[in-house]
Design a protein with these regions (language model features):
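C-terminal partner/receptor-binding element of secreted or periplasmic proteins
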Residues: 126-159
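Extracytoplasmic/secreted envelope proteins and their assembly/folding machinery
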Residues: 43-46, 50, 67, 146-150
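C-terminal segment of classical bacterial N-terminal signal peptides
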Residues: 16-25
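N-terminal export leaders
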Residues: 3-10
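Beta-strand/loop substructures that line and gate deep hydrophobic ligand-binding cavities in soluble
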Residues: 108-134
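Mature soluble domains of exported/periplasmic/lumenal proteins and thiol-rich metal-chelating peptides
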Residues: 31-37, 76, 99, 116
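Terminal, regulation- and interaction-focused segments at domain boundaries
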Residues: 25-57
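Compact, glycine-rich, soluble single-domain proteins
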Residues: 50, 54-58, 62-107, 111
């Protein structure tokens, strides 16, 4: 019975993994990076995300066009833009637990184009951030941050 359940679970996992490249579902990797495929162009993805951040009352700190920075430095890269935002009353709770967690706050969401022209979003998983910094007493806050980033990235997942 246990073996059958294990095989069933593994088959389900394999199906999810195989379907993932064509799905807008967020993909978390062991390095803590969560990637989500966007259904929109680069510019529209950035526009939708920044508007959603502001509509949620979250502070938009900066939008950094990394491809422009690279071009200005004489380097050619695919489109890549870093969006920096956060909610200081929430984010500073992580810093109060571990000051070095400031390396991961405010939130940074990368919008980039891959070699096939597909637009993606990427951010650091909040559970991974908690583990990285050894923060064990901010579970509800990490849960809230995870819910917010999932909501923001969902704004670019469907047409």
């Amino acid at each position: 019975m246990i073996r059958r359940n294990f095989n069933f679970a593994m088959a389900g996992l394999a199906t999810m993994v195989l379907a993932a490249p064509n799905s807008p579902v967020a993909l978390a990797h062991e390095n803590g990076v969560v990637k989500t495929r966007s259904s929109y162009s680069m510019l529209e993805t950035i526009d939708r995300i920044t508007k959603d951040v502001e509509a949620k009352g979250i502070k938009l700190f900066d939008v950094i066009d990394q491809a422009k920075l690279a071009k200005d430095a004489g380097v050619d890269i695919k489109p890549s833009t870093l969006i920096v935002f956060g909610n200081p009353p929430l984010g500073t709770q992580f810093l109060s637990a571990r000051p070095d967690s400031g390396l991961d706050w405010p939130v940074r969401l990368l919008v980039f184009e891959d070699d096939k022209g597909q637009v993606w979003t990427a951010y650091t998983d909040f559970k991974w951030i908690a583990k990285r910094h050894g923060i064990k007493n901010r579970g509800p806050q990490f849960m809230k941050a995870s819910e917010v980033i999932a909501s923001i990235t969902s704004s670019v997942q469907t047409r």
